[in-house]
Every structure is written in structure tokens, then in C-alpha cells.
From Swiss-Prot:
Assembly: The complex is composed of two ATP-binding proteins (FbpC), two transmembrane proteins (FbpB) and a solute-binding protein (FbpA).
Domain ABC transporter positions: 11-241
EC number: 7.2.2.7
Catalytic activity: Fe(3+)(out) + ATP + H2O = Fe(3+)(in) + ADP + phosphate + H(+)
Residues that, per the record, bind ATP: G43, P44, S45, G46, C47, G48, K49, T50
UniProt entry keywords in alphabetical sequence: ATP-binding, Cell inner membrane, Cell membrane, Ion transport, Iron, Iron transport, Membrane, Nucleotide-binding, Translocase, Transport
Entry keyword annotation includes Iron: yes
PANTHER family found in the cross-reference section: MALTODEXTRIN IMPORT ATP-BINDING PROTEIN MSMX, TREHALOSE IMPORT ATP-BINDING PROTEIN SUGC
This protein's name: Fe(3+) ions import ATP-binding protein FbpC 1
Family under the similarity heading: Belongs to the ABC transporter superfamily. Fe(3+) ion importer (TC 3.A.1.10) family.
One GO cellular component term: ATP-binding cassette (ABC) transporter complex, substrate-binding subunit-containing
Organism: Pectobacterium atrosepticum (strain SCRI 1043 / ATCC BAA-672) (Erwinia carotovora subsp. atroseptica)
Molecular-function GO term, any one: ABC-type ferric iron transporter activity
UniProt-annotated location(s): Cell inner membrane
């Protein structure tokens, strides 16, 4: 069982397998999520992350395994019996209802008094910065506002577990940024145990306590965002979590040797390691006009990205990607520089 820490588990998935015919989309997955944590499922298309979410919701029954919420086995229960709310990519709002009616619909189905519903709708709208929008309709508000209404509709029911199925994928970049901040703020404010699915790495990092990366139905790595980026467990993880330059290296007690260039050995590298493959993040490499011959490189491609350039260099016959601050240097193809590799952006890779 993969757990986030020593806290008591609130949502548990035990040996979950899901097959569609001969196709196994979840392969013996185990996970335990503590109360109040936000965990994001991240991975390439078809990795099984949405199927995991649907299984927790009760929309997809596992072929094998059990799902527990707050200590109770809910594997055979419907979504209505699990005390769960789900925020969808498509918002799933009723166009013939006002926003207030949309948000209060769940309470109405539970038979709550009208006065209570009206009051809680006002409170929910205030939470998502839409005070006074009760009487508007879906076609009168923007996509970002529609997603806020969908979030308010989920929060008003005070569920034990909140699920998010790629909720920001239909929004533009600026709206995605503000909306993910609002989601994280409210999740922490109400301490709701949450499971979030996205294919966007930056979104996963911004909203999550922990990120679980999947590939081909299996867990590749689970950890805090910084851990996954700085200490990827495999080649797949190194490449999936961002750009990585990968080179063979040898080690001494105090240095890492790559093509004769000696770099101070980072803290945390295993003792006794003599040779391996290392990954280097692009932001850990800088260019200089001075250095040793082993550091000399030639620029082959330059792409302007606004605040920075993405630069490809040829180094000892190998291509390397790095980032250059646009206010400090203006690189051009054919220019010769000396590169410097900073230990903080280096990690040892397994051969997976």
C-alpha cells in the first residue's frame, strides 16, 4: 500500500484492477490518502488516471479490489451512497435553471427547507466570488464563472471527498491560473480530502499536496511536487516531469565527471556510487565566456520564449537543452560558450 505519510488513511484503494475485455487499464493499484489532502493523478493519455477517479466516484466498478472511504468499504455503493461530489471538465450545469437553482439542486434533492437552501446558495456563491449571481443563467456567464458555479455546487453539499476530472482544461491560460488558486484555497479552507485528475504538470504542482504519476495502469512514482521534479525515480519520470538532459557519468567522493568536466557532487547522491546515468534540468545550466575546454559548447538552436530563451547546444557531440535569461544574454546559433552545470539540478537515474 502506497501511503502519503503516517496519518490515518481516509480514502484507500486496495489492489484495484480494471479490465475492459482483454485490456487492463488499472493494474493492481494501491493507494492510501489521509484526511484533508489533495492528491493529483497525473500521466499521459490512456494511463488509467480517469478510470481511477471514476472508480472512486462509483461510476466504474473495479474488476478486482476494494475502495474504502472513511473506513467503510464502498466498492459496491453507487455515487449517491458515497458522500462524494465531482467537478467535471464540462461543468455539467443545467441550462434551464438559474445559477442559484443549479447550486442548490443537491440540497433540494435531499429535501432541505427552501430558506436553508437559499442561505447556503448565497454562502456558496460568496465563496467563489459570485455574490449576487443567483438569478443569472448559464448562457449569461463566462466559462470561468461556469466552473466556479460547478465548484460551488459541489462545496454546498459538504462532501467527505471531492473529485476533479480535468476541471480547467476548457479555460484559457490566465483563467486556469486563477481558478486553480481558488480550488486550492477552498480545498485547504474546508480540509476536504480531494482527488484531482489532469494532464497538465504545472496545474498538478500548483494544487497538490502530493502527485501520483501513472503510466500504463501502474503507479510510476508518488511524492510531493518538488520531490518528483528534483528526484525522479526513473528515466520515464525524468522526462515526463519536465525536460531533462541525460548523460553517462562517473563519480568520486566529491565530484561528478561528465566528459571530463568535474562538477561538485550533490548532497544526497548514494555513497559508493562509481558510475551511472545522470539527469540535468535545463535551468541548472548557464553559459559563460570563460571555462575549461571540457565545458566548451556550440549553440545550434535558439527559441525566444518571452522572459527566457530555450537554447540547444552541441556538447561533446551530444545535444543539450538549457534556459537563458533574455535580459542577460542574447545567444545566436553558431556562438561558442562554456557551460556551467549547477549541482542542484542534477539527479541519478535508474534504468527504468
Amino acid at each position: 500500500m502506497i501511503t502519503l505519510n503516517t496519518e490515518k488513511s481516509f480514502v484507500e484503494l486496495k489492489h484495484i484492477t480494471k479490465r475492459f475485455g482483454n485490456n487492463t487499464v488499472i493494474d493492481d493499484l494501491n493507494l492510501a490518502i489521509p484526511q484533508g489532502k489533495m492528491v493529483t493523478l497525473l500521466g499521459p493519455s490512456g494511463c488509467g488516471k480517469t478510470t481511477v477517479l471514476r472508480a472512486v466516484a462509483g461510476l466504474e466498478k473495479p474488476t478486482e479490489g476494494q475502495i474504502f472511504i472513511d473506513g467503510e468499504d464502498v466498492t459496491e455503493r453507487s455515487i449517491q451512497q458515497r458522500d462524494i461530489c465531482m467537478v467535471f471538465q464540462s461543468y455539467a450545469l443545467f441550462p434551464h435553471m438559474s445559477l442559484g437553482e443549479n447550486i442548490g439542486y443537491g440540497l433540494k434533492m435531499l429535501g432541505r427547507p427552501k430558506a436553508e437552501i437559499n442561505q447556503r446558495v448565497k454562502e456558496a456563491l460568496a465563496l467563489v466570488d459570485l455574490e449576487g449571481f443567483e438569478d443569472r443563467y448559464v448562457d449569461q456567464i463566462s466559462g470561468g464563472q461556469q466552473q466556479r458555479v460547478a465548484l460551488a455546487r459541489a462545496l454546498i453539499l459538504k462532501p467527505k471527498v471531492l473529485l476533479f476530472d480535468e476541471p480547467l482544461s476548457n479555460l484559457d491560460a490566465n483563467l486556469r491560473r486563477s481558478m486553480r488558486e481558488k480550488i486550492r484555497e477552498l480545498q485547504q479552507q474546508f480540509n476536504i480530502t480531494s482527488l484531482y485528475v489532469t494532464h497538465d504538470q504545472s496545474e498538478a504542482f500548483a494544487v497538490s499536496d502530493m502527485v501520483l504519476v501513472m503510466n500504463k495502469g501502474k503507479i510510476m512514482q508518488l511524492g510531493a511536487p518538488q520531490e518528483l521534479y528534483r528526484q525522479p525515480a526513473s528515466r520515464f519520470m525524468a522526462s515526463f516531469m519536465g525536460d531533462a538532459n541525460i548523460f553517462p557519468a562517473t563519480f568520486t567522493a566529491d565530484s561528478v565527471n561528465i566528459y571530463g568536466y568535474l562538477i561538485p557532487r550533490p548532497q544526497g547522491f548514494a555513497a559508493g556510487l562509481s558510475e551511472s546515468t545522470v539527469g540535468i534540468r535545463p535551468e541548472a545550466i548557464t553559459l559563460s565566456h570563460q571555462g575549461e575546454e571540457s565545458q566548451r559548447c556550440t549553440i545550434t538552436q535558439v527559441a525566444y520564449m518571452g522572459p527566457q530563451y530555450e537554447v540547444q547546444v552541441d556538447w561533446h557531440g551530444q545535444s543539450m537543452l538549457l534556459q537563458v535569461n533574455a535580459t542577460q544574454l542574447q545567444p545566436n546559433p553558431g556562438d561558442s560558450y562554456y557551460l556551467q552545470i549547477h549541482p542542484y539540478g542534477m539527479f541519478v537515474l535508474s534504468e527504468q
